[in-house]
């Protein structure tokens, strides 16, 4: 009965049917956290499905596809369940690819610091009216409202979880003045930002910040750590049985990051050292993508289980996550180095590369362009490919359709479809991209008693959409 109800909730979610959403609200199921928000007319607040408060009467509930839509309707966020802590909307929200690309750019700050909607639309190649119509249809709010809500929610998160000065939080959240931040905060939440700091210890500029990132269970933390451990670079990353650590650099500020998982509370804990408040938004975005925090495991499992070969793998490894990238260029370089050699061999060469550059961090595009790469174990062709990638990396625009990005990558010497798809899958976190022509996928199917050709695999993968990346991950597990 529970599984049947889960399927109904998933398949009807996008329509936000009142009875179905209310059933999810009553059960406080964390698997639906962030997939909708409940506006309660009797209190004027909106909540997450997991809110510990008494369940409101159904006639007092209105369901919204985003926090922005709830705020736009006049509701204020609940102080108990704190909607600012909810996982972000799943990447598949709305089947419209333009919406996904626009959301990614907004998350990267495309509408912060006075940047205009017309500039965003120019990058996307569509008109403002059309983009507003798409956002209203899929998210219940305009692009500017979505961007404003994200700024406010991140600021609220920092106010609650850190001791950073309010001025720094305002600027670090994407507001270009403290006055505008205060006005927007009061309008959205009904009180000043300073209210969040009442009865709390004094503001300080500390070298260590702790942030929490809620996720939808289940979460295959052990599987993700295993993937990262096998590929960890000696001078940069440390992966233990329970945590992932790495050195980081944001706009010239060197620091470190340690992430662990609290499965009981369905959240990751990130300890960030020596990174100013102004750059915590960037760090937060990178963490969410690296650990695939906003994935929808219920939807993924539901769709992939239609394939009888994948069904037992999905059951055996619930909550599989797509390993993302701290830095997209790093993954691209490692993908090229890893062409046609083992994971261990690629790791050895990457360690030599990091040691050769000597900064204690993964090399930037400029550093690789100007570096002597001879003697690392790379062929002359690989070196040429790395130099060309470094020269052209900045020209790859996330606003473009993914098909165009794949074509641009494949146009570079030494990069074929496998490498291009792998780069886009991990660097851009694309859930529906997988490395075509990957022999390990064919080996996985063969081990599962389903030998097939590349053409057969391509046809089979059409049934995994929009989760082909996750389907590939499951077959890699089997291989």
Predicted region positions:
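HhH-family (HhH-GPD) DNA N-glycosylase catalytic core used in base-excision repair
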Residues: 2-479
């Amino acid at each position: 009965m529970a599984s049947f109800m889960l399927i109904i909730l998933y398949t009807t979610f996008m329509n936000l049917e009142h009875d179905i959403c209310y059933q999810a609200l009553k059960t406080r199921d964390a698997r639906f956290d962030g997939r909708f928000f409940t506006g309660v007319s009797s209190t004027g607040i909106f909540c997450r499905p997991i809110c510990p408060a008494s369940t409101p009467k159904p006639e007092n509930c209105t369901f919204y596809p985003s926090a922005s839509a709830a705020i736009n309707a006049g509701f204020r966020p609940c102080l108990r369940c704190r909607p600012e802590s909810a996982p972000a909307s799943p990447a598949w929200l709305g089947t419209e690819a333009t919406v996904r690309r626009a959301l990614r750019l907004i998350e990267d700050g495309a509408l912060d610091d006075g940047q205009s909607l017309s500039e965003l639309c120019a990058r996307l190649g569509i008109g403002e009216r059309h983009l507003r119509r798409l956002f209203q249809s899929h998210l219940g709010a305009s692009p500017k409202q979505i961007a404003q809500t994200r700024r406010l929610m991140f600021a609220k998160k920092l106010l609650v979880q850190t001791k950073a000065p309010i001025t720094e939080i305002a600027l670090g959240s994407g507001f270009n003045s403290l006055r505008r931040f205060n006005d927007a905060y009061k309008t959205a939440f009904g009180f000043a930002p300073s209210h969040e700091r009442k009865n709390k210890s004094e503001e300080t500029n500390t070298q260590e910040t702790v942030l929490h990132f809620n996720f939808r269970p289940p979460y295959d933390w052990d599987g993700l750590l295993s993937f990262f451990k096998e590929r960890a670079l000696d001078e940069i990353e440390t992966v233990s049985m329970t945590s992932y650590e790495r050195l980081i650099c944001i706009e010239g500020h060197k620091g470190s990051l340690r992430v662990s998982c609290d499965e009981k509370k369905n959240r990751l804990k990130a300890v960030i050292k020596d990174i100013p408040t102004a750059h915590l938004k960037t760090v937060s975005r990178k963490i969410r993508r690296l650990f695939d925090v906003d994935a929808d495991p219920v939807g993924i499992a539901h769709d992939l289980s239609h394939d009888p070969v994948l069904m037992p793998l999905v059951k055996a490894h619930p909550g599989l996550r797509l390993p993302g990238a701290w830095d997209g260029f790093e993954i691209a370089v490692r993908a090229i180095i890893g062409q046609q050699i083992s994971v261990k061999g690629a790791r050895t060469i990457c360690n030599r590369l990091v040691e050769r550059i000597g900064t204690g961090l993964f090399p930037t595009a400029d550093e690789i362009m100007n570096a002597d790469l001879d003697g690392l174990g790379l062929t002359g062709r690989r070196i040429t490919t790395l130099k060309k990638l470094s020269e052209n990396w900045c020209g790859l625009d996330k606003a473009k359709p993914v098909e165009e990005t794949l074509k641009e990558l494949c146009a570079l010497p030494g990069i074929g479809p496998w490498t291009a798809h792998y780069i886009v899958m991990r660097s851009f976190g694309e859930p529906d991209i997988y490395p075509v022509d990957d022999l390990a996928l064919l080996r996985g199917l063969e081990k599962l008693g389903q030998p097939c050709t590349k053409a057969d695999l391509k046809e089979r993968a059409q049934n995994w959409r929009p989760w082909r990346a996750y389907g590939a991950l499951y077959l890699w597990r089997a291989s």
